[in-house]
Curated annotation (Swiss-Prot):
It comes from the Bacteria. Pfam families: Hexapep (PF00132), LpxD (PF04613). The keyword Ubl conjugation does not apply. This is UDP-3-O-acylglucosamine N-acyltransferase. One of its GO terms (molecular function) is N-acyltransferase activity. Pathway: Bacterial outer membrane biogenesis; LPS lipid A biosynthesis. Belongs to the transferase hexapeptide repeat family. LpxD subfamily.
Length: 351
């Protein structure tokens, strides 16, 4: 069902300054290029300012400086992107689950399910699990023994929680995610791998989001821990005993090896990899495809790898990289020879 909200109501909801017709009805959100007369748009990135001229949106979320030059209706806010984020939930068409248990769900006799929770078709909830009020568990979810899901949690269809996974309040988990799978732990005995039982669990804080097909392994001894407000994209691998600090965000395909600790307010771009048993301090930004091989103790942005080039140029660069050892050796020899004939023996490049 499409929501219809008056522009004045949206201004009140945001605490925004209304410039225009407060009675105008808004039925959805769209980009500056695509928005129609009943839709709200926003300008967050200056590179899209050029689209304001021909924008057909019913209204636009704008900063004060941009609103001065805009002839159409606007909601003036300090941060248009944040305002868009808040309003987006008012127009979200995602169906709302009704409280209750579907007849096909299988629930252990000693599991505790709050009457205000929604349990979907063919869900399985094992012994000792506790499901709080307002939780939605989608079709075909598996909730293992002694798991706990806090108030307001939302599990899409086909989420798997192995035993002893504890989840905080308002956590969102997308389809295919697996929490509490066995960590990759083996001891080598004369070339033969002997399995190590993974007897820890997984602890997830409040307001966490976990993307499609992301895996968070259980701890070998203590729990794997994900802090409050952490946001995890799709297809992320978090190994056993990893600790992730509050409000850290990770894009798709990040891989974190066992026992690594990541601080608060970090950002890991797509494809980042981290070796095990290292510490990353707070407020670190790792750019895409960065390979982290040692601890980071200073906040800031870090990168590794090579950026894209035209293929022919990249091949030349790769060939030069293979020659670096030889070039360094020849440079040392040249410096030595220059030093032998330079008064005072100074052959450094800065004189």
């Amino acid at each position: 069902m499409t929501a219809t909200i008056k522009l004045g109501q949206l201004a009140e909801f945001l605490g925004a300054t209304l410039s225009g017709d407060g009675e105008k009805e808004i039925t959805g959100l769209a980009t500056l290029q695509e928005a129609g007369p009943a839709q709200l748009s926003f300008l967050a990135n200056p590179q899209y300012r050029k689209y304001l001229v021909d924008c057909q949106a019913g209204a636009v979320l704008l900063k004060a400086a941009d609103a001065e030059a805009y002839a159409g209706d606007a909601l003036v806010v300090a941060d248009p992107y944040l305002a868009y984020a808040r309003i987006s939930h008012l127009f979200d068409p995602k169906p709302k689950a009704q409280a209750g248990v579907h007849p096909s769900a299988v629930i252990a006799a000693d599991a505790q399910v709050d009457p205000a929770a929604s349990i979907g078709p063919f869900a399985v909830i094992e012994s000792g699990a506790r499901i709080a009020a307002g939780v939605t568990i989608g079709a075909h979810c598996f909730i293992g023994a002694r798991c706990e899901i806090g108030e307001g949690g939302w599990l899409a269809p086909r989420v798997t929680l192995y035993h002893d996974v504890r989840i905080g309040k308002r956590v969102v988990i997308q389809s295919g995610a697996v929490l509490g799978g066995e960590g990759f732990g083996f001891a080598n005995e004369k070339g033969v791998w002997q399995k190590i039982a993974q007897i820890g669990g997984v602890t997830i804080g409040d307001d966490v989001e976990i993307g499609v097909n992301t895996a968070i392994d259980r701890g070998a001894l203590a729990d794997t821990v994900i802090g409050n407000g952490v946001k995890l994209d799709n297809q992320i691998q978090i190994a056993h005993n990893v600790q992730v600090g509050d409000h850290t965000a990770m894009a798709a395909c990040v891989g974190i090896s066992g026992s690594t600790k990541i601080g608060k307010h970090c950002m890991l771009a797509g494809g980042v990899g981290l070796v095990g048993h290292i510490d990353i301090c707070d407020n670190v930004f790792l750019t895409g495809m960065t390979m982290v091989t040692h601890s980071i103790t200073e906040p800031g942005a870090y990168s590794s790898g090579t950026a894209m080039q035209p293929a022919a140029e990249w091949r030349k660069s790769a060939a030069r990289i293979r020659q670096l050892d030889d070039l360094a050796r020849r440079l040392r020899q040249l410096e030595k020879r220059v030093g032998d004939v330079t008064p005072g023996g100074n052959a450094s490049s800065d004189g």
